[in-house]
Amino acid sequence: MPAQAGSNHMLDLMRRNHTREAYLELIKHFRTKIPGVEFSTDLISGFCGETEQDHLDTLSLIQEVEYEMAFMFTYSMRERTHAWHKVEKGVWTDDLHPAIKKKRLADIVQTYRDTALKRSQKVDLNQIKLVLVDGYSKRSTREHPQMTGRTDTFKRCVFNVDCGSDYQHLNNTIQLQEGDYVVVQINEAAVSTLKATPLFRTTLTEFSQMKWKAKDFKVDFNGVLRRENVIV
């Protein structure tokens, strides 16, 4: 959900077809209708005519939405764009000093990182997640092999290679392969990466049928998956 900026003044200058209020209402609607949905966005600092208040409005938007991922840039002129034509005609000026753009971008990045960490620890930590295995982690070693994959919100997840063959046979250990789906429990939640305990290999169909029960699953200190005090 690209926002570009958090102030209506900037959105109008950028010719975006939404207001801050409409954008936030849409975010609220999606979160109500799709529990667990997360958002990524694009943000620009230092667009022509951006004031300090415009910048603060962008920071407050980040804090309110709590994006999972963000692509953040300083504004630079591109030929044939609306802003380029305005500057060429002398209507606008690319009036912010590069140092101000850089400082504002740093503010945006730090605000994003702070809120993303807060949200990840709130919505990811200790949760059961489905992960698509990408392959071995770059930090994997022969002594400590680790895999990496993506959650259903595209967050990177790192975990050991061994897990149960399926949810009925947790003690039947297999080694995960690229392309497998694995159910994990999140142990550590950072801004862009999760660390997890792999529980068992699964399929999309199987997981979709059991996902509504995920809140009932617990992992004890021995790594045994239990539901309602009964070993699954």
Task: Please give the residue ranges for each predicted region.
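Terminal RNA-binding accessory module
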Residues: K86-V232
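Conserved non-cysteine loop/helix-boundary elements of the Radical SAM core domain that shape
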Residues: P2-I100
